[in-house]
Amino acid sequence: AVIGNVSVTDPDAGDTHTYSVDDARFEVVGGVLRLVAGQSLDFETEPSVSVIITATDAGGLSYNEAFTVTVTNVNEAPTDIALSNSSLAENTDTTGGLAVGNLSTTDDDAGDTFSYAVVGGADAAVFSISGNQLVITDGVLDFETKNSYVVDVEVTDQGGAGLTFTKSFTVTVTNVNEAPTVLALSNSNLDENVAAGTTVGNFSTTDADTGDTFTYNLVAGVGDTDNAAFTIVGDQLQINASPDFESQSSYDIRVRTTDADGLSTEQTFTVTINDLNEAPTVLSLSNSNLDENVVAGTTVGNFSTTDADTGDTFTYNLVAGVGDTDNAAFTIV
């Protein structure tokens, strides 16, 4: 860059002169003071430069003088954008628009003013600018659904047309542990007469937080009437004693599931006992005495049956086996 012409006053007419500069960034070539190739001056760090130029004539005599080179400021483009905050907690409600953080700009020109605009990025549609704030509007944030947003912001230097800088930002959603929402039991029916310790079913938990672990407990509360009849081992519900449909056909229990951070939900369950047809246990005859000489076909007595299954009907037959010696003398009607 040419700065200016250098001339010297010398009483010796026709003398020739060479020039040197005490600052290596400058040189005098052909009587012109200029910057050495590859050098530049920065107004913001050095608004003026003092140089000493020495003129030497052909006879070796010299003269020097100090000059001040004034650096003229040129508006420069911004070089960076910063965002004061780039993370938001899960469950934050952004429905009405929420400021993520404040935008600031790095620019060599002190005192410059700037404007900002959303110009791109995968999630540009949910962002806007308010003053120097980056604003998001995307309802209630859910880490499990979307854990980060990408937006491109452009800053424009108000002091000069076309002086801009663009930067991409990633706004992250931080996970917040949420309580379990649903407790389920894989099976709630059990045949009567199964052995004590039989597994009814397995518990499972629905939770928005992927990878959570859970513990299960029988707890007091509405619907806990028959908690004492069961034990939970791991995620298995086991019955403590062999159930009998005729004694109790269903059981009510209350269970709590708790995640690793102590958040929980409770659910009541009804375990239904399936009725199984059981064999009769007692066969009785209402009378077993008969007078001699009664007519053939006289009724000796009536059979009745004891059976755990209420309402069962029965048929009766004479059968072969121990004690059947006189079966042929009787008929069952």
Model-assigned labels for residue ranges:
Residues 1, 6-8, 12-81, 85-183, ...:
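Acidic, turn/loop-rich segments in luminal/extracellular domains of secretory-pathway
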